[in-house]
């Protein structure tokens, strides 16, 4: 009986680790990239992300997965010189990522943010498959 409980706990731990949406996003950008980052979600009433360094890993903190993804995009653009766009969501990250020299925090006081214009829904979205939707969701998060 104890072995069953242990196996259940291990299974839950694996599922919880693999379920991180930002780590999955990193893997879609570049296979193996999630191992170069430490992702931390912290409760906060303010939308924010932080960039920090721990050893050879970049730490990205935020109050939810979307703000962590925004932090990832900020890091890639302003620290690593990697530009992701609506048409190109994959990149080859360097073996050793550029270090975050000084802890960096960005907050927003905007309560609402939006994406798309009213035409997008009629022109193209009706024809998207899951792969295309996944790319769009990634882009919205970044």
Q: Where are each of the predicted segments found?
A:
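Absolute protein N-terminus
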Residues: 1, 19-20
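Sec-dependent signal peptide recognition
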Residues: 1-9
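Hydrophobic h-region of N-terminal signal peptides that target proteins for export
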Residues: 9-17
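Feature activates predominantly on carbohydrate-active enzymes
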Residues: 21, 25, 31, 44-46, ...
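A short, Trp-centered hydrophobic/proline-enriched beta-strand micro-motif
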Residues: 35-39
